[in-house]
């Protein structure tokens, strides 16, 4: 995996059953070919043979830093500025606690009503824990900018809306926030690996994201947090675990944070997950994000056109203008849940989101025009033949 190519898709790099069209890589990316072997090797070559020594001999303890340096170019930041571990919910908590600490005199956390629930729950929980009278404001996404004022401590937003794919103008919002003296946190859950990002240029203080969506790190893959390097050493981490200490193995009784991004580490890294993510990240040496974006736009437009022509009863809820949309396309229907279940049974995997959304992730790494047309044709068949009416498609599963 060394030469870059503009050739997309790269289906050859993935293990996806050939009879399905996978439009859910925005929720769980598929495995890269060879992922299973990676997991086997960690267990049989490293853990089994070296036991505890593998923390050194197989570089286990350095995996968070190594993988953080693979994430950095994908989100447009400098090496050494990304800490890895835990889940996105926890990284969001760390960022938010730190941001509130930077603006102790202000009380408003500004998010929006389209944000992913966990981001909002984390804020609500932190507000309760701090008990200092903070308020969470959640105006509609298109009104966020006008709510930024001198009361706002932190602007805490998800760049690409998980339901509709609507994309915030990150540069404009960050600039406005900074003009008002607010700190910014961008959640890149649906952006990293999907759209070109230049987080360093935005000058945001924090960015967080997960790696099991468009970065294909596998279920439970560790999350990331970027902290602007000029402020990282003045930040008091909220979750002060031993691996964020400046010398974990000194076993000091007093917490003293690492003088680097490492202070945002907490505890023992999930090594198997890290190795899988490390392997999956190699793909970004082969492809260019601007090519990905171009291809995603082309595929999305084709899909919208095909679906609207074949299923006019479905309403597009994603922005029609590609520049305001991330890498997903969503439609609304009262029967969205049943339609998606019937579609999945017919080999086209998308997903359902409350209250009435059919959601399709467009990942050009492993999707082409034929896949888009086949997905639209299958959707048309499910709708016209009313296959979704079958009782088995009405039953709600635990994970939708
Ligand atoms: C997927 C997603 C999450 C998931 O958080 P986890 O802690 O990894 O479960 C959080 N926020 C957003 C915006 C997401 O899209």
Show the residue positions of the predicted features:
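Pyridoxal 5′-phosphate
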Residues: 1-400
């Amino acid at each position: 995996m060394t030469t870059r190519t503009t050739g997309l898709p790269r289906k050859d790099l993935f293990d996806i059953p050939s009879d399905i069209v996978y439009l859910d890589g925005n929720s769980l990316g598929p495995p890269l070919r060879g992922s299973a072997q990676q997991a086997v090797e960690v267990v049989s070559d490293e853990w089994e043979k070296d036991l505890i020594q593998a923390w050194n001999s197989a570089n286990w303890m350095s995996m968070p830093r190594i993988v953080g340096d693979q994430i950095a170019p994908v989100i447009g930041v400098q090496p050494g500025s990304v800490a890895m571990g835990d889940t996105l919910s926890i990284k969001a908590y760390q960022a938010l606690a730190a941001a509130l600490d930077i603006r102790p005199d202000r009380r408003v956390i500004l998010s929006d009503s389209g944000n992913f629930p966990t981001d909002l729950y984390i804020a609500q929980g932190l507000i309760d824990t701090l008990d200092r009278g903070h308020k969470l404001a959640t105006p509609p996404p298109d009104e966020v900018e006008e709510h930024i004022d001198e009361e706002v401590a932190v602007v805490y937003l998800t760049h690409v809306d998980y339901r509709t794919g609507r994309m915030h103008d990150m540069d404009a919002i960050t600039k406005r926030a900074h003009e008002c003296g607010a700190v910014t946190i961008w959640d890149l859950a649906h952006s990293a690996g999907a759209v070109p990002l230049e987080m360093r240029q935005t000058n945001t203080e924090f960015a967080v994201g997960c790696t099991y969506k468009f970065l294909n790190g596998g279920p439970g893959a560790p999350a990331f947090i970027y902290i602007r390097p000029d402020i990282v050493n003045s930040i008091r981490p909220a979750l002060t675990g031993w691996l964020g200490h400046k010398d974990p193995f000194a076993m000091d009784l007093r917490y003293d944070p690492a003088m680097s991004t490492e202070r945002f580490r907490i505890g023992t890294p999930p090594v198997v997950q890290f190795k899988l993510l490390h392997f999956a990240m190699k793909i970004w040496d082969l492809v260019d994000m601007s090519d990905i974006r171009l291809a995603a736009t082309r595929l999305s437009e084709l899909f919208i056109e095909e679906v609207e022509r074949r299923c006019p009863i479905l309403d597009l809820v994603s922005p029609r203008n590609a520049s305001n949309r991330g890498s997903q396309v969503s439609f609304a229907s009262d029967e969205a849940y049943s339609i998606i279940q019937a579609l999945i049974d017919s080999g086209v995997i998308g997903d359902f989101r409350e209250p009435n959304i059919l959601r399709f992730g467009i990942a050009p790494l492993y999707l082409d025009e034929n896949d888009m047309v086949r997905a639209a044709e299958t959707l048309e068949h499910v709708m016209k033949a009313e296959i979704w009416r079958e009782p088995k498609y009405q039953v709600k599963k635990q994970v939708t």
